């Protein structure tokens, strides 16, 4: 019989993080390796998909790098698309093709990225597509830009200076833990963080970044000083970073590019825009079921109850707050014309609970 006692330790290879984060994230960029066809939205669900479809990636390819980073966060519902040419012109031409995702892939992205590209033309194209599909676009201020130059760029009204609820501007680039010379776009980290939030109504504020240990430019970081670089950037509508007491980097700021210092508009919050989009999708789906019904008060009341039920389900998930309302506007409706008019109101969860503001959606159901 064996007489040895003690502890036996065996070394095994580490298992990859399961790709369970299902937020629909679309990445537009360049790729010169793999099997990815140009101008064709393509789904990536697994590590194997990424290896086959994207290959190892060329020196200036943006898609393989971005997908690898998103998969670090467990993202398993990615859409990639490249243009006919591996440059800005090709990328610019590919962005509008995201409108085809619903018909070609059966899904519509909720977050759109275009890593390494942030010209005025690129941002304008992103702005158009996210308005069209009800999503948000994440862009980065160019690597190695100083904090002062980043603040100056935000004063413009184009490119990274655009003021829009659906555009999120990120700064700085992050240094990879294993190779500090390898810079990673903060926007891609943010997309991974959004994919891992409990629901669309949660803010990314203070969520940790994975696999980074520095910024590409020197920055002063603080939770309390109004003169720190991260606070100056946040006041200009830039999503940036901070360091928690453990020294780990976290997202700092949950606002989009339409924010400016002191503004209390609820729609400057990323999660407020995402909540409005999600509730709109749910309301549309329920409204469609009533299109074939006779237009009268009974139908109007049933549809209102359906809206209330929808909001109740989302509040139970803590995606939105309690206190939601669905109002049938009989004075704006026309039974003879088959038109029913409603107002939907709800409040998202805000990082600053002193701001109590609701989001309103106007619904017109017409047969």
Question: Language-model segments: which ranges?
Answer:
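N-terminal assembly/attachment segments of tailed bacteriophage virion structural proteins
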Residues: 39-86
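C-terminal edge-of-domain segments
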Residues: 330-367
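C-terminal structured domain segments
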Residues: 298-345
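Short, intrinsically disordered N-terminal pre-domain segments
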Residues: 1-24, 364-367
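Hydrophobic alpha-helical bundle architecture
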Residues: 290-298
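A glycine- and small-residue-enriched flexible loop/hinge signal that marks low-structured segments
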Residues: 9, 19, 26-31, 36-38, ...
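Short loop/turn motifs at secondary-structure junctions
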Residues: 74, 106-108, 320
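Phosphate/oxyanion-binding active-site loops and adjacent basic polyanion-contact surfaces
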Residues: 87-91, 299
């Amino acid at each position: 019989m064996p007489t040895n006692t003690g502890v036996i330790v065996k070394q095994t290879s580490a298992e990859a993080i399961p790709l369970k984060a299902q937020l629909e994230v679309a990445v537009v960029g360049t790729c010169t390796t793999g099997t990815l066809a140009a101008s064709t939205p393509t789904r990536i669900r697994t590590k194997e998909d990424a290896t086959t479809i994207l290959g190892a990636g060329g020196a200036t390819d943006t898609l393989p790098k971005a997908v690898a980073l998103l998969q670090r966060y467990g993202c398993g519902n990615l859409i990639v698309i490249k243009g006919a040419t591996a440059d800005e012109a090709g990328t610019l031409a590919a962005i509008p093709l995201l409108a085809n995702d619903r018909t070609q892939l059966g899904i519509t992205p909720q977050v759109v990225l275009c890593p390494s590209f942030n010209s005025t033309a690129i941002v304008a194209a992103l702005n158009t597509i996210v308005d069209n599909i009800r999503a948000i676009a994440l862009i980065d201020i160019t690597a190695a830009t100083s904090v002062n130059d980043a603040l100056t760029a935000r004063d413009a009204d184009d490119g990274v200076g655009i003021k829009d609820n659906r555009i999120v501007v990120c700064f700085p680039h992050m240094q990879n833990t294993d190779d500090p010379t390898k810079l990673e776009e903060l926007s891609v980290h943010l997309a991974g963080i959004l994919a891992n939030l409990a629901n669309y109504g949660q803010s990314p504020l203070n969520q940790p970044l994975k696999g980074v240990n520095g910024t590409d430019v020197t920055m002063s970081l603080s939770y309390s000083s109004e003169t720190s670089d991260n606070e100056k950037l946040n006041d200009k509508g830039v999503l940036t970073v901070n360091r928690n007491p453990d020294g780990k980097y976290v997202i700092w700021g949950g606002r989009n590019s339409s924010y400016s210092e002191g503004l209390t508009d609820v729609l400057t919050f990323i999660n407020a825009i995402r909540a409005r989009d999600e509730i709109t999708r749910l309301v549309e789906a329920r409204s469609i079921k009533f299109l074939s019904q006779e237009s009268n008060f009974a139908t109007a009341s049933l549809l209102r109850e359906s809206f209330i039920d929808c909001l109740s389900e989302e509040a139970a998930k803590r995606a939105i707050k309690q206190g939601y309302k669905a109002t049938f506007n009989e004075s704006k409706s026309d039974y003879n014309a088959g038109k029913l008019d409603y107002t939907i109101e709800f409040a998202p969860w805000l990082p600053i609970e002193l701001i109590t503001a609701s989001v309103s959606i106007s619904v017109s159901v017409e047969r």
